[in-house]
Amino acid sequence: MFLDTAKIKVKAGNGGDGMVAFRREKYVPNGGPWGGDGGRGGNVVFVVDEGLRTLMDFRYNRHFKADSGEKGMTKGMHGRGAEDLRVRVPQGTTVRDAETGKVLTDLIEHGQEFIVAHGGRGGRGNIRFATPKNPAPEISENGEPGQERELQLELKILADVGLVGFPSVGKSTLLSVITSAKPKIGAYHFTTIVPNLGMVRTQSGESFAVADLPGLIEGASQGVGLGTQFLRHIERTRVILHIIDMSASEGRDPYEDYLAINKELESYNLRLMERPQIIVANKMDMPESQENLEEFKKKLSENYDEFEELPAIFPISGLTKQGLATLLDATAELLDKTPEFLLYDESDMEEEAYYGFDEEEKAFEISRDDDATWVLSGEKLMKLFNMTNFDRDESVMKFARQLRGMGVDEALRARGAKDGDLVRIGKFEFEFVD
């Protein structure tokens, strides 16, 4: 089964908790703190594997969770960092943040790696908090929570050339005779319901990848027929071979077919029309094909002002192999002078994929529940909260100082908080002391 979209959830590992411990040895008075740091949580890493062809592996396995780091240990020893969770994806996978829609990365090279969720850092042990004023601190940090996010995956097959056209114009037949691919071929519409990929080698020794894409019909860009299900695969191609049935065996006008398909490509993505097209006049072995071709050329030339450049037309027959060598040589030549097309605007991409906090974002936010409880939230505040060890009084006092330093106390007073009011952070509640 060919699967080219998937929505998954990834969770990086939490950092290990830091430890509170003291050196207790004979003949070592005032041994001091000896608790080590926790280990780093594992990242979730996507790795491109050229052996994969679809996103089928994500159909039944939609949750990926990396291991957490080990806790800090006595004698100042750090906990072991967790191994990264490496997830294999096929070439041509685009990764988006499902919440924002931003493109995180476009994975196109074999072996390429990208961290989609960063593991949390380990919490600090009490060795890190020793000062001249407090040489034996009973303070440690919990490990930082690992990044958690929902991702939308899209597979756009890697092909230099895309074959487009109405159903049953001979795309699959053409692919089968110019490559070793074995697409399903039949005398009915939508015989091809998944993209097929093959490699072409010309007589001069040049090679390129060709994709046979399921047939388009009018309204495909609005979801008619197979809809936009496979239009995305055209986006990676550099050259489009527009296959026209010159025999008009389906009772349609070849020139109207040509205009209709171009309209669907343009409606789906304006940038698709920037790709150079070669018109492939197929089924020239059939009666009336030559007459239809002459009429097609006439209509095309009469309306050439509508096109930036008049496309080349190559008469062929996929059945008899007439004209194939000339077509393939011309395609290879056009590929040589056609650069890669940018798939996404910079505005679509995240400037940098990282796990941190935006300096421009508020450090905290204050709201009030229906029960009159003040609620504190915010990414930075929650990070401090999650890393606080509430089993240790000194850690709690440190957290209170951090809140005061962030201006939380002052902000609560400004909002009207009074002595004894309940304040909630996550599931933790405490009284406000003015």
From Swiss-Prot:
Localisation per UniProt entry: Cytoplasm
Organism encoding this protein: Streptococcus pneumoniae (strain ATCC 700669 / Spain 23F-1)
Cofactor(s) required, per the database record: Mg(2+)
Name of the featured protein: GTPase Obg
Binding-site list for Mg(2+): S172, T192
Residues that hold GTP according to the record: 165-172, 190-194, 212-215, 282-285, 317-319
Self-association state and partner proteins as the record states: Monomer.
GO cellular component, one term: cytoplasm
Pfam families recorded: DUF1967, GTP1_OBG, MMR_HSR1
Domain annotation OCT: ranges: 356-434
GO MF: GTP binding; GTPase activity; magnesium ion binding
Record PANTHER family: DEVELOPMENTALLY REGULATED GTP-BINDING PROTEIN-RELATED (PTHR11702), MITOCHONDRIAL RIBOSOME-ASSOCIATED GTPASE 2 (PTHR11702:SF31)
